[in-house]
Amino acid sequence: MFSLQDLCRKNTFFLPSDFSKHTLHLLGLYWKGHGSIQRIKNDGVLIEHDLLLSINEALILAGEEGNNDVVQLLLLWEGNLHYAIIGALRTEKYGLICEYHSQIQDWHVLLPLIQDPETFEKCHDLSLECDLSCLLQHAVKYNMLSILVKYKEDLLNVLFRQQIQGLFILACENRKLEILTWMGQNLPIPDPEPIFNIAVVTKDLEMFSLGYKIVFEYMENQGLFHLTQVVRMVMINRHFSMVINKGLLPFVLEILKHGGHVNRALSYAVTQNKRKILDHVVRQKNVPHKTIERMLHLAVKKHAPRKTLNLLLSYINYKVKNVKKLLEHVVKYNSTLVIRILLEKKKNLLDATLTRYVKDSTYFRVKEFMQDFSISPEKFIKIAVREQKNVLIKAICEDIWENPAERIRNLKQIVCTIKYESGRQFLINIIHTIYQSYSLKPEEILKLATFYVKHNATTHFKDLCKYLWLNRGTESKKLFLECLEIADKKEFPDIKSIVSEYINYLFTAGAITKEEIMRVYALEYAMY
């Protein structure tokens, strides 16, 4: 059975304001010098119905006063004993500390909770097996700069200097910039390189920049050492390689601020295929044409991918001045991709220029351009078809192919290479105007008729059939049967209808038999 005191101490109650001091003593809810104390929710206490504190804040206060009764009450309310110890350390209430000493397994656990350096050091001193070196390590870890300042002379002692490097690395790993700055200004750091390595791994640009300040300013001001230009560039180039490999553009720019060479940055960006860095440096630093070509040679040597080569070529508008040097690299390193890109680009540029000529210039200027760049008539005609320039097409056809039959044969071949329907029909119309303008041999007309059928050129085919019937009559039987077969296979109903009409004429004239018709298209002409 619980006592009233146990119930009040273990549970959350609102105490009546008229409880006497004697009653509060009996309940164990009186804090000497403060008044009543009661638990509020899970993590707070209310003192004398007025002051609200967290349980751990109250433990620090009780520890400072050495009030074990209140400490026990607050621990009952799930407070953290460490805070009572911290409070006791502040005011050196070692009696209270001795009371709970056995419950603390490792005094280092308390250190992150302590804000002031004196208490921090007192707490660390309770770890009897630890020495000054351990204290300094924890001072770095928990940002207690004043402790380092206090023991500066010890750190400068010849016997202790060997530990400076370890403390420096620890400060880097924990990213304690204030401590790093102080160490750079006051201590002889044997090797400052870890600050750069760790800054890159953690992507901490501020710490990376501080590293250069330590090396080039603080350490030189201390007279510790002076970097020769060669050693300085070796270090900076190593940093270039490290940060570009990870694609850290802001770090690259930071290195350039501290003496890094643009060409070196470009070289690493090219060899490691970091196009974002390459593009930014080229554009921001106005890199000259000659340097870009050197980077292009390097890219060829390293077999850089297409995107990197294209990017470099774009800076010089795909115009390589030192072609001989480029070809030397291509042959020496068996890296031909750049040549393919240049040839492709030349083709694209020629196509674009020719298109502009077709749209805006006379035939004579177009012809001159074609001759200068050895452009085939087929390429010109395809572009002219796309731009619907029938006059230009007729002009070049007459200029190149004097024989109308040859003209039609070549245009028919071009029709077969055009992939879009409107382009094919446009060129077929031009072919038909040539047919109408000249007298072709019968065999050429027959070939043209089958060509029209294959491309479903209904109107032109009908016109041609009329001519054939009027001029050749029943001699066209074989052609009509062939056209019927093609139209049937390709399912061109309009063509089939036209052919059927002329087959009817042939049948009526006795030039064709029912069996011949049935062999070609039995179902359609079963009536015969």
Swiss-Prot record:
UniProt keywords, alphabetically: ANK repeat, Host cytoplasm, Host-virus interaction, Inhibition of host innate immune response by virus, Inhibition of host interferon signaling pathway by virus, Inhibition of host JAK1 by virus, Interferon antiviral system evasion, Repeat, Viral immunoevasion
GO cellular component: host cell cytoplasm
Signal peptide: none
Origin: domain of life: Viruses
Pfam families per record: DUF249 (PF03158)
Protein's GO biological process: symbiont-mediated suppression of host innate immune response; symbiont-mediated suppression of host JAK-STAT cascade via inhibition of JAK1 activity; symbiont-mediated suppression of host type I interferon-mediated signaling pathway
Induction: Expressed in the early phase of the viral replicative cycle.
Cellular compartment(s): Host cytoplasm
ANK repeats by residue range: 129-158, 261-290, 292-322
Major localization listed first in the record, in broad terms: host cell
Residue ranges that the Swiss-Prot or TrEMBL entry lists as coiled coil: none
Function field: Plays a role in virus cell tropism, and may be required for efficient virus replication in macrophages. Interferes with host NF-kappa-B promoter activity mediated by TLR8. Mechanistically, inhibits the phosphorylation and subsequent nuclear translocation of host NF-kappa-B RELA subunit downstream of TLR8. Promotes the expression of the autophagy-related protein host ULK1 to degrade host STING and inhibit the interferon response. Also inhibits JAK1- and JAK2-mediated signaling and thus negatively regulates the IFN-gamma signaling.
Subunit structure: Interacts with host STING1. Interacts with host JAK1; this interaction leads to JAK1 degradation. Interacts with host JAK2; this interaction leads to JAK2 degradation. Interacts with host RELA; this interaction inhibits NF-kappa-B promoter activity.
Family: Belongs to the asfivirus MGF 505 family.
Full protein name: Protein MGF 505-7R
Lineage: Viruses, Varidnaviria, Bamfordvirae, Nucleocytoviricota, Pokkesviricetes
